[in-house]
């Protein structure tokens, strides 16, 4: 299917690449379907990925695998909350992303470690949860960690 985006123009997205967030994403609860946009040639080493809404061209969130910034990232979430991803969750199918805030001065970029976005690539379901870890913040410095 063809998807209109503000930042990437018209892109082709196959149905099996659409991630459904039954509850939406915090702050964007009305939009349920997304896809990940990135440079496929750099897939293994890419740091910033875009979570693009299928039905809203202007809604694209920069996200990142948190281990690029915090190697020991381990969010604590209630297992009950993960049930919306499917009945048989396998660790190999799960990916965790965290939203980025990228201001004009990129050195002030932050990552939201408090509310990870969890995707099961077997069921293509996603959910954003609030981690119980008190050490994780909504705005954690990320630029200096990326540069290291």
Model regions: which residues?
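A cross-family signal for N-terminal binding/gating loops and helix N-caps
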Residues: 1-72, 82-128, 134-139
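Conserved small/polar residues in nucleotide/adenosyl-binding loops
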Residues: 144-148
